[in-house]
Every structure is written in C-alpha cells, then in structure tokens.
Amino acid sequence: MKLSPSALALAASIVASTSVFAADTVSPVPVLLQDLAKYQDAEKTTAKNIETFDTLDFDVYTHQKWDRLGESHAADILVHYPDGHTSKGLHDHIEELKPMFVFAPDTRIEQHPVKFGQGEWTAVIGVLEGTFTQPMPIGGGKTIAPTGKPFKLTMATIGHWTKAGVMDEEYLFWDNADFMKQIGLGH
C-alpha cells in the first residue's frame, strides 16, 4: 500500500505527538504497567478471598468447625440475614449458625456454582442442603416434629473483606418461604 504525502505527514505528526520522544509528553507505558500491577494484585486478593470463602463453606461451616470461623470472619463481623435482622460479632454469628444443625444435622454446602469479586467485595452463590430429621426447637421448650424432608436451597453471600483477609460485613440471601415449603412447614 502506498500512502500519499499528506497521509504520511498526518501519520508522522500523530506518531510525534504520542511518541516517547516528544518533548511535551510522557510515555503512557509506565502508567499502564502500574495500573496492570494494581489490577493483578487486586485479582490475586480476590482469588485468595474466594478460596478462603470456599474453605469456610465446604469445611468450616459444613463440619461445624466453629473455632475456625475467625479464619474468614473478623471478630466484629456484621452479618445481615434474609429476614432483615443482623448480628454483630463472631460469637453471635456462630450462635445464629448452630440451630440449623440441631434439626438438620446433615446440613452442608458442597458447591459454589458462581463466585466472583472485585476489590474488597466477593459474591458467591452456594447450594445449602440437608434433611429435617430431628425436632426443631421453636422456643419455650417446644419443638416441631421432624418431617424427614430434604431441602436444597440456593443462597447468596456478599462479603466485604478487610486487608487482613477476613470479612467484616456479610450479607446472606435465601428464600425462607421456599425453605419452609421444602421441609414441609409451608404452603
């Protein structure tokens, strides 16, 4: 391809105006390399946070290793539950998690079909499964008899992570009406 003299002049002026050799401009390459390094660091942090979250659900939660919850949760964790209430602190969060295992001792999370994050945030979809095989305490010394029905709930967790690699805030989402229906207590 042969360029006309005016096209060559235009191309030369564009190159000169963006060239590292132009006196009044700075090369964008170092800035781009810095941005790339920041992006790669952020991606590594996100991957590490998601790996920590996988361990949380697949091992710590599923096997009720409450003494290890601090590996993924800050001591002052703020947790938002699907019904709108919150808990503050690791101890209170653990106390909120334990009752599920009383009436469904086989409760488990074994898969995260979707997981991603950006910066200090992660979003994970999990599948919570179990079977209502034991009496469910409802307060005042009363219980609901087990139905023997299994449940399989899709849930989502949005987590805010600190630089220390633990969540300081967690948003939990699942459909309580669907859960009650699956275990035979809803319509």
Question: Language-model features: where?
Answer:
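Bacterial N-terminal signal peptides
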Residues: 9-17
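Intrinsically disordered and other compositionally biased segments
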Residues: 6, 18-22
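Bacterial N-terminal signal peptides that target proteins for export
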Residues: 1-8
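C-terminal and inter-domain tail/linker signature
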Residues: 21-187
